[in-house]
Every structure is written in structure tokens, then in C-alpha cells.
Amino acid sequence: MVRGLLVKGGSTRSAYYYDPQKGFPFGHSFTKRYSNDELQEHLILLEARARIGMNKKNCPEHVSSIFDYAFSEMLNNAIEHSHSKQITVSLVLDEATLRFVVEDTGVGVFNSIVKKKRLANNTEAIQDLMKGKTTTAPQAHSGEGIFFTSKCADVFQLQSGETELHISNGKTQELSINSLKPKKRGTRVIFSVSIHSTRHISDIFRAYQT
């Protein structure tokens, strides 16, 4: 949700607002805008981890693995598919939570899927994404990145155009499709996972892959 110039992250009980141009307001934070010119996500990942001081003492290995996968997948989507000239990443690591945002001003994830798959609207694009098999460039990517990233998160938000997909993974998964005002040009991904999460990415892959 966007309120004025602030972006809302998290669920209702743990909501927070931040300026995407400045990054998160607390914890070990890092924000940087990159020119989308031969970017390599693994190098940005290494830089981001170093800048927020991420290590085994403040982030368990299984949570670190979730972050590495989710951040790399969402950044790869922006690099390969958005056609955006610039990509902005924001991260924060505090005593309870690891969060990141990947944002571009490109074609927009829902709009791209609607056009490529000749769907009626953004809701149909979301339904297709949640099947776990969708990509707008199948020769370049498996298309499962958004699906599995949404399963790894405590809270996952995918915002583009007039639409937000909001997923909360507690004892059960809660999924909602919300209206965005003002509209989001391009795509914004907001990902949050607890440092104390018991999820393991290998278990998530086993649960949903056949």
C-alpha cells in the first residue's frame, strides 16, 4: 500500500511505513539505485549482505538461504524482464526481521503477463503467477521465482499498476488482491521474513515441486 510518498510494508499487526527513496528507517539498512546495464545479481547480493552486516551471528543460515534465493530471484526478474533503466534495492536487518524491496519503473509484472498470455486483467495474471509456472521470458528463466519467493516470506507484497498482491504466511496462507493508489509505475516487491523463522527453503521446494 502506498500512502502519500510512503510505502506500507508488513501485515496489519506489524505494519511499517518507509520512504522508498531513503530506505527503511531502522536497523542495519542499505538503499541503492542501479543503472540496469549488465547488472549481475550475485554481485549486488554480496554488496547488500556486506552493507547490512549480515552474518551467522545475526541471521541463521537457513534464513540467510531464504534471503539469498528470494532477493536474487526478485532482482533477476527486474534485471531480465522489466525493461527498466534503473532498479532500486532497499534492505534492513534488525533483531527480529530481515526485509528487502526491489523496485523498477519498467513495463510492470502484471501488465507484461496480461499481454504475453492474452489475459483479461491483473487478477488473471496473479492467478497464473500463483500456479508457479509463469514467466514472461520462458527461454531466460523458469518462471517459478515469484511463486517460491511468496512461499518463503512471512509477508510478500507484489505491487504494479493499480494492483497489489499481498500474501501472509502464518499457520495458514492469507492472500489478498488490493487496489493501489496512486498507481505504481513498474513493479515493487516487498519481502519480509522473521530472523526466527523455522522455514527451510529445501522443504518449500519439496512441498511444491513434483
Report the location of each language-model feature.
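Bergerat-fold GHKL ATPase/HATPase_c domain
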Residues: V2-R3, V7-S72, D203-T210
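Conserved ATP-binding N-box helix of the HATPase_c
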Residues: C59-E95, I146, S150-C152
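Regulatory and interdomain segments flanking nucleotide-handling catalytic cores
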Residues: D94-T97, V107, S168-K171, I201-D203
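Short beta-strand element(s) in the Bergerat
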Residues: A96-F100, T187
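Acidic ATP/Mg2+-coordinating residue in the GHKL
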Residues: D104
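Flexible ATP-lid and adjacent glycine-rich G1/G2 motifs of the Bergerat
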Residues: V107-S179
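C-terminal end segment of the histidine kinase catalytic
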Residues: L158-S160, E174-A207
